[in-house]
């Protein structure tokens, strides 16, 4: 995507979208306990970047969640040929590239906007980092959200 695109301001058009997340808490708790067991046995080691005690502590805190339901709201906002994808969390860079390449507009991803609701990384990255281990947002939810954002932008382009 060329960074030399000229921004041309024009009409303001936006869509507000939502996505509901209701994880299976029994499954989530089993995964957390398995992660704790794997850390203690040495089977899971993220190296020096994340101390084992911190990761175990994070998982133990998450085990206290008996219920987790999340209704996310996010937006696609156009001002002329400038498009903002506004999201209340951290989307993996892979998703930002997908959203930017889905439009001919100058696209900006605004993360941590209107709140922070965990990390939304590609499903293949789940369980590999501090951001996804213990995350109550199930693997694969980010892909569904990004598909909604891209589809919304494409509808706005018509």
Which residues does each predicted region cover?
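Non-catalytic substrate/cofactor recognition surfaces at enzyme active-site rims
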Residues: 1-158
